[in-house]
Amino acid sequence: MAQELDLELGLAPYDPWVLKKNLTESDLNNGFIILPKQDFEKIIRQMERGLVKNLGNGVEVKVHIIEEGPESDDYTLTLVKCRGNCMFRGGWYNMVKAKCYKPDDEIGLMWDKWSRRFLFHHIN
């Protein structure tokens, strides 16, 4: 019994952003952002066990913002798991204001396990 393999290659551009979200007024004004649960579960699997174990207490994480051109910024945020949801706070509001994000801006997020930090990008 032969099995068929699908060897068709696509020409879609590479998209590294595991988590994508369109920012809301609430995300921008409340001092925290709740991250989409299903997408964030993919990121948690890549993180160190000790870090994940302490999410209930809140852990400081580095966030490297990737910009077009030579500019980039680093921020320290608090990542917390509360009532089954993960959220950034403790630095989120300052980052939002410094980068002038607006409602409906799309952001992308991924975990860089080698440098143990988040990579963050303003997609559009």
UniProtKB/Swiss-Prot annotation:
Keywords from the named record: DNA-binding, Nucleus, Transcription, Transcription regulation
GO cellular component, one term: nucleus
Membrane spanning residue stretches: none
DNA-binding positions: 18-124
GO terms, molecular function: DNA binding
Domain of life from the UniProt record: Eukaryota
Keyword Nucleus listed: yes
Major subcellular site: nucleus
Presence of keyword DNA-binding: yes
Subcellular location: Nucleus
PANTHER family: B3 DOMAIN PROTEIN, TRANSCRIPTION FACTOR B3-DOMAIN FAMILY-RELATED
Protein name per the record: Putative B3 domain-containing protein At1g51970
Species in which this protein is naturally found: Arabidopsis thaliana
